């Protein structure tokens, strides 16, 4: 919805496509869109994108093939949390035990970093940059293969994605097994 508002305000055309969670269907969708779109904005299921990240979609990003929006990986790494607390980390407590889907390298500009490795679930692809360098989009290790082909992938580290993870309630699991709970 927020992206549509930005598109209307900036007189940008957009098309919304839905795809199943199958990695091959996702790769097929990207292949089909790469020749007819200037940019592909991909948002995986259960992710809400903040306004600052959406504004990045409309920035020029010259010499960039893909801009990823780093997100949190499911679960809390308690060993990492303990380590950071003991070291007196200046990182916010709410982030100390979290791992992210993107590993970054050197800073390029404010909030934009070069990517070492990523498995981002939200990203924007500048198709004209990618189209020149990569003939195929692969379902497995898409970002690794794009980097191998010489594509430049950067991360917008100021993104604040809200990621929803499905967890089963313990009482539902027990109830399905025939255990009565009060």
Region annotations inferred by a language model:
Residues 2-43, 47-55, 59-62:
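Active-site-proximal specificity loops/subdomain of glycosyltransferases
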Residues 18, 68-69, 155-157:
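Structural signal for conserved beta-strand scaffold positions within catalytic alpha/beta enzyme cores
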Residues 22, 72-75, 158-162:
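Short beta-alpha junction loops
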Residues 25-31, 78-80, 164-168:
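Short, solvent-exposed polar/charged micro-motifs at secondary-structure junctions
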Residues 39, 64-66, 153:
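Short, Asp-centered acidic motifs that coordinate Mg2+ and/or phosphate
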Residues 50-137:
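Conserved catalytic core of nucleotide-sugar-dependent glycosyltransferases
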Residues 112, 117-182:
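C-terminal catalytic/acceptor-binding lobe
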């Amino acid at each position: 919805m927020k992206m549509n508002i930005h598109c209307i305000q900036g007189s940008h055309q957009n098309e919304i496509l839905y795809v199943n969670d199958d990695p091959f269907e996702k790769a097929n969708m990207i292949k089909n869109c790469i020749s007819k779109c200037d940019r592909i904005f991909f948002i995986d299921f259960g992710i809400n994108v903040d306004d600052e990240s959406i504004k990045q979609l409309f920035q020029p990003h010259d010499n960039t093939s893909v801009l990823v929006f780093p997100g949190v990986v499911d679960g809390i790494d308690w060993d990492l949390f303990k380590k950071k607390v003991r070291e007196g980390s200046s990182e916010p407590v709410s982030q100390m035990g979290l791992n992210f889907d993107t590993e970054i390298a050197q800073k390029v500009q404010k909030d934009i970093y070069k990517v070492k490795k990523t498995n981002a679930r939200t990203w924007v692809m500048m198709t004209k940059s990618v189209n020149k360098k990569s003939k195929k989009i692969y379902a497995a290790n898409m970002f690794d293969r794009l980097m191998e082909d010489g594509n430049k992938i950067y991360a917008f580290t100021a993104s604040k994605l809200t990621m929803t993870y499905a967890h089963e309630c313990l009482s539902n699991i027990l109830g399905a097994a025939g255990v009565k709970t009060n």
